[in-house]
């Protein structure tokens, strides 16, 4: 089929759409990892920067003790850091991902360093330090085995692509392999650090306002941020709330930092001349705080007395004790209070002045928010939106693993400390601790986190998930997933985090979120062109060197004029103020265009708040836009002739494309289409307004009137890029009802197709469609997602008709059985069985692969062992049926006597009603030297009644009837549909996109071309109609059809044409279940639950019971709930109604309650009822049973 597309152009479409798609081709097609680049870059930074920062950035103290006049400290230093390629245990042969999967081992590499142990002896009196090396530096000391991300910079597939073996060349990577399983670390939302945000909390009948900042140095990759909170209480007093102090007035703390007088404090907080309302409120707050005007020394004394700490100051001398407390206070104020605020001078006192100004800045935000909420003053700011993407950061793989590495590295140092203390006898000859470093501490911690998904805190659970290989799109979508962490059930009930927020435009797909209560809106998927930044600490010196001399530092700024300047922030650190902000902003932006600064640096100039923020931190959502200058698009189609890649385009035309993060996005004027810019220019070129009469004709109440002129700054490359990976493949999604797009997102992940090209070398649990086809009608984005290589569906001839009115009611389908016999929608299911030889630690005996011998093996199952070979497994192409043993394993009995059977059976049994065949057997040996047998069994899945299908418009249905082709509808040309769907599915669901797909697909099939169904591109239906008429078809795709059962012509024309349908994994063969007899539970004696355990079918206590009673089938009800369930025969005392017990060695029963032996009745009850009476008795509730003999006798 030709690869040219049908060009349906709108007469209003005056811009070159093809040039914009050619630009998108540059972005996606040259780099197969572009969709997982954020994970790859983050992991590379974890290896190259985060681990060295942890190992070399701390003190690495393993032991410290104080004597009378000196402090003796032992520490480690790490140099020559490096990581080796992943290898097998022999450290000679390279390990590749496919080998790790086969051998059930982790794909990891050894991280090594040159380690030196030091002894520091500090003289307390003279403060001099004497340092010496203990032993000698040891090279290539293993620190840990680090899991390696597949296709990252340190993966063997990247290091040695020439011998990559049979790995799929289309695989994008971005996942880990832990114990043979593929694991993906999901991206996690978190609140923005180093930015004060104002929120409210409910306190009885009032709202309390507070401003909070999560403070962590920008250069620090991992670590827990220090929370700094300023609260306004109900009495309008403003207090400081941090873990180190008791409740204390914020103004006392400001004085302790160095701003002493009330006048200086007020000037630092607000502009006295312009903000009268704020000044009145501030005076009320200062009076309510009951803080007298004290000096800095007095304020420090107050703060020292307010320290809330477990640290004890045991010195008996009050002066020494006070000095110790002051030193500890100084340490808190220097290291733990707003650690991200620094002057850059290295002077702690100047740093404190900066912190005082920053706190005043926080108070200013708090007061403005309070005035907006309490008095509804419009010019003041409202509270911050905690759901806005502006106030969020995304934690990627590198940062998450870095946090775990730091946690387990500290544990490793603690283990070294314990060993050192036990071995250190004399400080003159201390032991060398380097040989006792345990790399397993970090290795096991990282492996366990990736295996379980638990990354430490309560809100960091489920971050690592098994990579689902259902189809290619499903696997790839894991890499684009972002989750909102929820701590407990109370946060799960909140609705606001689930809503689609306007700041998610362009960054999160509006359609891709799971259905159902638990995860709807909390699990999101990134849009196609969205990226996430990583930390760029190398950019900080460049920015700081440029700003030297261009801003006024805070210590030299005039406090009374402080608010007349624009504040300049770098990663949340207030560097200073300036009047010349336009030049600074333009210069930095020009440096960003020229490449002197990274394109990912954020430059946010907020005119309303007079603040200029520069960001180099990681976790910011960012995407490229076309730039617009003077309402003219800078991008020209001829530029594409000079470049071959995206990076080359950025280098050759640096000012055409700009990367914009979410906060900077708030200050741009974005044109969704280039036509918007042309319309604005058209309005601008109109004759200006010269009279009041012309002014009155303008609708001034409508800001979006056609006469309003807009000056744009940026333009979308194409608006279809706001959709996600899966929804980009929906044809014409802008013509469908919105929920249908969400449904299709969930259906597409369940569709059968071809999930990876090397599936023959793997043993995944998945499905393979025999004849997957590229859709006739698809969006341009489909080639960026790989669906043209790994399709998941077939082009089907679909008729919309009720036909007989019986076979396809509701969402059921009539399907052409003859097409199925020819291979239509046939698939194979792949099932995996695996057994590993295990060692019994108690007896040191190992299990054995063999065909169990009934004379030697005990506990043989009720299964067929005849399919096994002598090696212990069924050979390739052996037909397997339900109950056949596929892998034979026996465990030796450690305590068996010579006359007993020596082995116990532990074989794997095939359980499925659908027969299969052994497709592949893989025999390997794991790292421990034990054999592994992996078996892949395939079973053919022919479409059957009840199997589920879905179109790409979310029109899902199940097969209701399989009709022979002779009974199907047919047209005069002999066209017979593959599927007939009910017309009632269209009016309510309004999936017009599917109708357009069918109409355009008909034209494409006739002309032998592919159709363009890209969203947000105009479709000229009249042009399609004309083309169909020219080809000899009815203009709207309707055809005269004949009844296949009687040959009569149908009185109405039928809409028929090609529509792409997906076969989903929900099939009757996997769900059909019935049971006559089988195993029961030990406690309740009822059938277990579930098809896999041969369980029973539950008759509910309400619905089914009431329905059976209403039908009058009481005997049937009794039979199913008692006779065929947990029937139990017992004896009951007629006198007291309690259970009677049989007298030992006698033939009669007695009641232990009333000693009755004559009036005993035998009854039949459900065993569950007997359990209920016993459980009630355990809480002192005695249940009594009245039998037929005593039912008429009233009880006292």
From Swiss-Prot:
One of its GO terms (molecular function) is DNA binding. Gene3D superfamilies: 2.40.50.150, 3.90.1100.10, DNA-directed RNA polymerase, subunit 2, domain 6, RNA polymerase alpha subunit dimerisation domain, RNA polymerase Rpb2, domain 2. It is found in: Virion. A zinc finger (C4-type) spans 1133-1154. Pfam families: RNA_pol_Rpb2_1, RNA_pol_Rpb2_2, RNA_pol_Rpb2_3, RNA_pol_Rpb2_4, RNA_pol_Rpb2_5, RNA_pol_Rpb2_6, RNA_pol_Rpb2_7. GO terms for cellular component: DNA-directed RNA polymerase complex; virion component. Residues 1074-1095 are annotated as: Disordered. PANTHER family: DNA-DIRECTED RNA POLYMERASE I SUBUNIT 2. DNA-dependent RNA polymerase catalyzes the transcription of DNA into RNA using the four ribonucleoside triphosphates as substrates. Belongs to the RNA polymerase beta chain family. This is DNA-directed RNA polymerase subunit 2. It comes from Acanthamoeba polyphaga mimivirus. The gene is RPO2.
């Amino acid at each position: 089929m030709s690869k040219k597309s049908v060009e349906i152009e709108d007469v209003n479409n005056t811009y070159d759409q093809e040039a914009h798609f050619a630009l998108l081709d540059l972005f996606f097609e040259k780099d197969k990892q572009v969709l997982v680049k954020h994970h790859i870059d983050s992991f590379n930074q974890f290896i190259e920067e985060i681990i060295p920062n942890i190992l070399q950035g701390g003190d690495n103290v393993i032991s410290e003790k104080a004597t009378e006049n000196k402090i003796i400290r032992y520490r480690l230093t790490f140099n020559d850091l490096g990581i080796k390629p992943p290898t097998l245990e022999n450290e000679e042969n390279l390990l590749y991902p496919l080998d790790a999967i086969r051998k059930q081992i982790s794909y990891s590499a050894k991280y090594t360093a040159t380690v030196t142990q030091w002894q520091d002896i500090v003289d307390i009196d003279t403060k001099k330090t004497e340092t010496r090396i203990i032993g000698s530096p040891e090279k290539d000391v293993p620190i840990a085995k680090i899991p390696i991300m597949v296709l990252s910079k340190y993966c063997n597939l990247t290091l040695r692509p020439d011998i990559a073996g049979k790995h799929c060349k289309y695989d994008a990577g971005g996942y880990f392999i832990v114990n043979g399983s593929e694991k993906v670390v999901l991206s996690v939302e978190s609140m923005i650090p180093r930015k004060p945000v104002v929120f409210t909390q409910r306190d009885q009948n009032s709202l309390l306002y507070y401003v909070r900042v999560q403070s962590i140095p920008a250069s620090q990759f991992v670590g827990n941020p220090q929370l700094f909170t300023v609260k306004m209480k109900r009495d309008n007093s403003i207090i400081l709330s941090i873990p180190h102090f008791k409740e204390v007035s914020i103004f006392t703390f400001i004085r302790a930092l160095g701003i002493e007088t009330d006048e200086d404090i007020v000037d630092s907080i607000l502009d006295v001349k312009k903000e009268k309302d704020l000044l009145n409120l501030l005076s009320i707050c200062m009076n309510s705080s009951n803080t007298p005007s004290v000096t800095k020394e007095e304020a420090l004394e107050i703060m020292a007395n307010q320290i809330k700490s477990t640290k004890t100051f045991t010195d008996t001398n009050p002066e020494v004790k006070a000095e110790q407390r002051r030193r500890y206070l100084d340490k808190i104020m220097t290291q733990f209070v707003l650690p991200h605020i620094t002057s850059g001078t290295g002077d702690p006192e100047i740093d404190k002045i900066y912190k005082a100004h920053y706190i005043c800045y926080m108070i200013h935000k708090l007061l403005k928010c309070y005035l907006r909420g309490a008095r509804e003053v419009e010019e003041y700011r409202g509270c911050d939106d905690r759901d806005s993407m502006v106030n969020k950061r995304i934690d990627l793989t590198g940062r998450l693993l870095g946090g775990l590495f730091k946690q387990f590295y500290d544990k490793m140092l603690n283990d070294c400390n314990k060993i050192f203390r036990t071995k250190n006898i004399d400080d003159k000859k201390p032991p060398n601790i380097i040989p006792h470093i345990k790399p397993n501490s970090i290795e096991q911690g990282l492996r366990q986190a990736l295996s379980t998904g638990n990354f430490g805190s309560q809100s960091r659970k489920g971050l690592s998930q098994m990579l689902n290989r259902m189809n290619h799109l499903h696997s790839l979508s894991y890499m684009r997933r972002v989750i909102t962490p929820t701590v407990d059930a109370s946060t799960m009930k909140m609705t606001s985090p689930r809503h689609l927020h306007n700041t998610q435009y362009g960054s999160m797909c509006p359609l891709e979120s799971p259905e159902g209560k638990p995860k709807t809106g909390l699990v999101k998927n990134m849009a196609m062109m969205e990226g996430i930044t990583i930390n760029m600490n190398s950019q900080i010196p460049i920015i700081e060197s440029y700003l030297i001399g261009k801003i006024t530092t805070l210590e030299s700024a005039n406090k009374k004029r402080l608010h007349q300047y624009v504040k300049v922030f770098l990663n949340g650190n207030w560097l200073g103020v300036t009047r010349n902000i336009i030049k600074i902003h333009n210069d930095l932006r020009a440096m960003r265009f020229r490449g002197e600064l990274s394109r990912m640096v954020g430059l946010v100039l907020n005119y309303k708040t007079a603040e200029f923020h520069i960001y180099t931190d990681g976790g910011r959502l960012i995407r490229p836009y076309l730039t617009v200058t003077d309402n003219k698009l800078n991008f020209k189609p001829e530029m594409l002739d000079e470049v071959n890649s995206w990076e080359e385009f950025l280098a050759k035309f640096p000012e055409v494309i700009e990367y914009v993060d979410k906060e900077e996005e708030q200050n741009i004027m974005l044109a969704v289409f280039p036509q918007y810019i042309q319309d604005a220019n058209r309005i601008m070129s109109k004759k200006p307004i010269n009279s009041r009469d012309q002014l009155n004709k303008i609708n001034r109440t409508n800001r979006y009137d056609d006469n309003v002129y807009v000056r744009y700054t940026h333009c979308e490359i194409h608006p279809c890029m706001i959709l996600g990976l899966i929804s980009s493949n929906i044809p014409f999604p802008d013509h469908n009802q919105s929920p249908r797009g969400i449904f299709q997102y969930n259906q597409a992940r369940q569709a059968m197709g071809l999930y990876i090209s090397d599936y023959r070398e793997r043993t995944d649990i998945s499905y393979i469609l025999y004849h997957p086809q590229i859709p006739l009608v698809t969006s341009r984005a489909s080639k960026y997602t790989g669906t043209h290589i790994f399709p998941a569906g077939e082009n089907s001839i679909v008729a919309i008709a009720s036909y007989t009115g019986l076979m396809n009611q509701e969402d059921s389908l009539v399907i052409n059985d003859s097409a199925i016999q020819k291979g239509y929608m046939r698939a194979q299911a792949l099932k995996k069985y695996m057994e590993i030889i295990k060692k019994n630690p108690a007896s040191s005996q190992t299990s054995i692969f063999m065909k169990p011998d009934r004379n030697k093996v005990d506990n043989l199952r009720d299964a067929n062992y005849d399919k096994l070979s002598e090696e212990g497994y069924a050979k390739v192409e052996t037909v397997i049926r339900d109950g056949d043993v596929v892998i034979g394993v026996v465990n030796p009995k450690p305590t068996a006597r010579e006359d007993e059977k020596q082995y116990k059976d532990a074989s794997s049994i095939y359980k499925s009603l659908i027969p299969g065949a052994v497709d592949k057997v893989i025999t390997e040996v794991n790292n421990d030297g034990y054999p592994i047998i992996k078996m892949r069994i395939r079973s053919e899945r022919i479409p059957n009644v009840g199997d589920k299908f879905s179109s790409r418009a979310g029109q899902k249905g199940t097969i209701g009837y399989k009709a022979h082709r002779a009974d199907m509808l047919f047209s005069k040309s002999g066209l017979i549909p593959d599927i007939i769907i009910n017309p009632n599915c269209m009016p309510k669901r309004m999936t017009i996109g599917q109708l357009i797909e069918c109409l355009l697909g008909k034209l494409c099939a006739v002309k032998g071309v592919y159709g363009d169904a890209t969203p947000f591109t105009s479709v000229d239906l009249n042009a399609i109609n004309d083309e169909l008429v020219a080809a000899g078809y009815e203009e709207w795709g309707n055809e005269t059809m004949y009844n296949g059962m009687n040959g009569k012509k149908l009185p109405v024309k039928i809409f028929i044409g090609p529509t792409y349908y997906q076969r989903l994994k929900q099939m009757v063969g996997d769900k059909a279940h019935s049971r006559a007899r089988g195993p029961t539970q030990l406690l309740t004696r009822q059938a277990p639950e579930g098809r896999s355990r041969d369980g029973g079918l539950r008759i509910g206590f309400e619905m089914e019971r009431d329905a059976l009673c209403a039908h009058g089938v009481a005997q049937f009800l009794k039979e199913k709930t008692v006779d065929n369930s947990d029937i139990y025969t017992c004896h009951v005392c007629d006198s007291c109604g309690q259970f009677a017990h049989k007298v030992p060695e006698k033939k009669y029963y007695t009641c232990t309650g009333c000693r009755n032996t004559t009036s005993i009745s035998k009854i039949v009850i459900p065993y569950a009822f007997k359990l209920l009476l016993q459980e009630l008795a355990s809480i002192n509730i005695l249940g009594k049973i009245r039998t037929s003999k005593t039912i008429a006798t009233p009880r006292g």
